[in-house]
Amino acid sequence: MISRRTVLQFSGALSALGLIPFAHGAEAQLPDLPLAGTWPLVFTDVESRKVTIREEPKRIIVANYIANYLLVGGSGALQKVVGLTQDHWESTRTGEYRVFTKAFPGITQIPSIGGYHDDILNTERILSLKPDVLLIGRTQFAANSQRVNLLERAGIRVIVIDYHAMKLENHVLSTRILGRLLGRDDAGEALCRECIEGLSEIDRRISALPSSVKHRTCYMELGNLGPGQYGNSYNATILWGAILKRIEAGSISEKNAEPYSALTREFVISRAPEVVIIGGSLWGNDHADQMRMGFTVERPDALKRLQGFRNRPLWQNLPAVKTNEFYGVDHGSLRSIVDWRFTQYLAKVFYPEAFKDAEPEAALVATYRRHLPEIDPRGTFMLSIREG
């Protein structure tokens, strides 16, 4: 994640929510706000908008981050959900969709109010469902400003949360908003503390390392198109690019003008990456040789697909190929309060001795089992070519 600010430097939005970010005397700096479960609730969302919720919401539309919503709220929070962005959820996050709908079959009966993987919102459908609260992401908010005004005039409280920017303060604020909104402060706080303390420890260990071991050249690519085409890479402001920036890896796409775009084969080869990372998921598209990772994906299948990328034409002389510094990661697991485990994993990839005690994949699965025991979290989330 990009931000390295401590809790004492968090935005006023955190204080306005009235939750304790850290120990070490932070409690004394917080305003005297109502306890959880008391209303009205007044706070500032990630778009710095003051939001007032006058009574406990009973009807909620979740237009983004349903996995985070359930991690914080637990299975009981699903009873409040009257609308979801269901369009293309199954085709763009197939593994996640299968796991969550198997555990909670009722999800499939919840009306769809737009696209899971785009910013399209169906205003008429939202109004017809009469929600008390609409939870949306930042890009949805930006793309639907006029619709948001219409919805708020109709009495719907719109709350903007964000896990895309990979900023610690947004992850924490969004999770605490969910915890307070759903009466699950303890669960939200536990997830936040794991994230905050985990990233702080990662930063501490990396800062103690000599500069000579940092900034190894790295190429990260989303493998949804298969080895025959080059998928997106990310600059330092978003997703994997932000993670690589944080751990001081030398991403060859770090300074790209666009947040995400595909690099050419010639450029990748010319930069001779020492480490290659392929992002996978389970996309329901026609690219049968796509990189598959995440929920429900068997390890041998993921490894075979990763080897397909390693065997690309003209890649045989890349340093990463020669030294087997070739890895797979689950793209679908990003944009979540638990995605700091991928920062930990990549820190271990780049600095194995400094993180030899870390077991991020096992810890990620354990977190799912602890906070959402109804789902089956088995799958392949982090992978090295050396396992083959």
Regions found by a protein language model. Give the residues of each.
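Solvent-exposed loop/turn segments at secondary-structure junctions
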Residues: 66-69, 87-90, 133-134, 139-143, ...
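Pocket-lining segment of extracytoplasmic ligand-binding domains
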Residues: 252-266, 272-297
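N-terminal export signals
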Residues: 6-27
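His/Asp/Glu-enriched short active-site or ligand-binding loop at hydrolase and phosphoryl-transfer sites
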Residues: 234-259, 327
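Extracytoplasmic substrate-binding proteins
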Residues: 33, 40-43, 50-52, 143-229, ...
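Short helix-initiation/N-cap motifs at beta->coil->alpha
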Residues: 46, 110-122, 256-265
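A short, structured surface patch at a secondary-structure boundary
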Residues: 63, 68-128, 133-140, 147
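Structural recognition of the beta-strand scaffold that forms the well-ordered cores
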Residues: 61-63, 82-84, 134-137, 159-161, ...
